[in-house]
Amino acid sequence: MILLKKAIAIKNDSLERFQTFFEKGRIMILHAPCGFGKTTLVNEVLCDRCEKILKISADRISDGIRDPDKWEVLVVDDLQTIHSEEEEQLLCALVRDNPNKRFVLLTRGAIPGWVMPFRLTGLMFELSAGDMFFDRETAKNFFDKSAVRLADGELDGIMRDSWGYPLALTLIAEHMKKGEPYGSSLLGEGTHEIYMY
């Protein structure tokens, strides 16, 4: 769920939610601010499950309509940029008219009201920022995959200070991989980098 060269860690809960989506759903929506690993999570989960994936930005939603036979899963990023009712209706029609297709929607904002009818039918599943915060086990797995050796108790401090925010953990791992010890100066530098992200 995090971009650090090949270091990716995914919470088991997120994997289970995607499994349920593939078994019972048609729409999966991930809504969280930047830095929660929405795109990384979707790329990682879908690459193992599907061959025909079309990824588009919301401002190119009409591209998904051109040839639905060429994709099994349509990934629409930046859903928060859809501002016209015409684009909203276009996406809703695409979902309704293609019952054998899956749709993965990513947004930095709240779930738009115009997709709520799909939620009420039970066809839509979601992952929020709260779902994407790393727990201790996922964070440890991430640091291990990042080849960052943590001293006793360091993970506790990192989790306390970062709250498990994926971007913060990525920045901490990048600095620690360079040999910087975890502490207030690294935390301050990381906070500045997050602010500038």
Each language-model region and where it sits:
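N-terminal pre-P-loop "Q-motif" helix
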Residues: L4-F18
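Sensor-1/coupling segment of RecA-like P-loop NTPase cores
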Residues: T81-H83, A93-T121
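Phosphate-binding P-loop
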Residues: Q19-G25
